[in-house]
């Protein structure tokens, strides 16, 4: 069911022309910064993949992919991608990328089962990136280092945006705070995961929550994560599980936490088998991607996705992602947004 967060006294700081120019500037500047910071080179990515190979991202495991038959392949079915989490790792092997280097791509996806609101659209655009790492780098310390560098690129982009449009004032803190999902649960045991995110983000401004996908001490997950890309079951620091997480910020325009990126160190052979067993998905072991990984034909890697429209929305202080990208929205949402000063494209 679609929902609308109504910002109080909202007024767009940019007109339509400035907004389009700002989107272009942010996208070009940030991806250059990301590429330089993590030593990534751009590659061309697919909009769809063949169904049944285990390449598409299953997200939380319940979202349906958009599918269609391909006439010239005997009506074999293709799926529009949800993300390129597993495709990128296959590409690292195909390109023969060495440790310390990686790839990034402009990913466009359709998520037909998304619940529409100010942050969630049917159309998803991300910088999807993946880098080859060594066995010794599969640690929380390495993960934190990469997160810190990505956050630095975000803040540099915020500085450029505020210099270009002085009416936009910076709000991101200098440093990002790290916390494990279990530690967050202990801090706020009576709150829901979303309420915990709001509380910690309002306190620190920018937060990386570690260990998303596995069950916590209350028997529940902080949030879902497919079992076959992020490693959420390997022990990290202080006996806590998980080598992955989310970058979130406190977004004053909407008065709530705001996820910018989901990322992590990827599963190795052992953690893949363990996570498939935990999720009762062991039948996936026979799929193309999983066989490649189990046969040690794929490199160890770290990767993630950074929302393009989301980053632009935050840095341009917009109230709705539909002010940044063209998509389909319920008519009553469009009408209500217009009353609130948010003109959806």
Predicted segments, located by residue:
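Class II aminoacyl-tRNA synthetase-like tRNA-binding/catalytic domains
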Residues: 2-120, 128-132
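Generic recognition of stable, solvent-exposed alpha-helical segments in well-folded globular domains
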Residues: 21, 25, 29, 138-145, ...
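Generic structural hydrophobic/aromatic packing signal, biased to beta-strands
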Residues: 23-26, 30, 34, 68, ...
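A generic secondary-structure signal for well-formed alpha-helical elements
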Residues: 34-41, 150-161, 319
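N-terminal pre-domains immediately preceding structured catalytic cores
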Residues: 43, 52-56, 168-179, 330
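A generic structural signal for short, non-catalytic loop/turn and secondary-structure boundary residues
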Residues: 61, 73, 96-99, 103, ...
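Extended, charged alpha-beta segments that form solvent-exposed binding/catalytic grooves
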Residues: 105-199
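A translation/RNA-centric and nucleic-acid-associated enzymatic feature enriched
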Residues: 110, 181-345
């Amino acid at each position: 069911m679609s929902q609308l967060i109504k910002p109080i006294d909202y007024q767009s700081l940019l007109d339509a022309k400035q907004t389009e120019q700002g989107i272009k500037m942010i996208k070009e500047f940030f991806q250059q910064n990301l590429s330089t910071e993590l030593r990534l080179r751009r590659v061309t990515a697919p909009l769809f993949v063949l169904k049944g190979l285990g390449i598409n991202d299953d997200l939380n495991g319940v979202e349906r992919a958009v599918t269609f038959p391909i006439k010239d392949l005997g009506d074999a079915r293709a799926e529009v991608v949800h993300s390129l989490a597993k495709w990128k790792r296959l590409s690292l092997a195909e390109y023969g990328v060495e440790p310390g280097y990686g790839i990034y791509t402009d990913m466009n996806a359709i998520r037909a089962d998304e619940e529409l609101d100010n942050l969630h659209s049917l159309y998803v655009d991300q910088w999807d990136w993946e880098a080859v790492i060594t066995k010794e780098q599969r640690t929380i310390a390495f993960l934190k280092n990469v997160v810190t560098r990505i956050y630095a690129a975000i803040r540099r982009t915020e500085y450029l945006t505020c210099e270009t449009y002085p009416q936009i004032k910076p709000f991101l803190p200098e440093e990002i705070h790290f916390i494990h999902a279990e530690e967050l649960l202990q801090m706020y045991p009576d709150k829901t995961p979303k309420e915990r995110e709001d509380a910690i983000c309002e306190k620190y401004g920018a937060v990386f929550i570690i260990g998303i996908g596995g069950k916590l001490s209350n028997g529940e997950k902080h949030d879902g994560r497919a079992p076959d890309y992020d490693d959420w079951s390997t022990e990290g620091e202080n006996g806590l599980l998980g080598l992955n997480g989310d970058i979130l910020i406190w977004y004053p325009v909407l008065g709530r936490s705001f996820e910018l990126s989901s990322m992590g160190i990827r599963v190795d052979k052992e953690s893949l088998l363990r996570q498939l067993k935990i999720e009762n998905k062991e039948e996936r072991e026979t799929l193309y991607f999983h066989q490649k990984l189990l046969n040690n034909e794929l490199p160890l890697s770290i990767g993630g996705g950074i929302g393009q429209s989301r980053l632009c929305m935050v840095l341009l202080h917009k109230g709705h992602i539909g002010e940044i990208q063209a998509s389909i929205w319920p008519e009553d949402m469009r009408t209500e947004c217009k009353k609130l000063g948010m003109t959806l494209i």
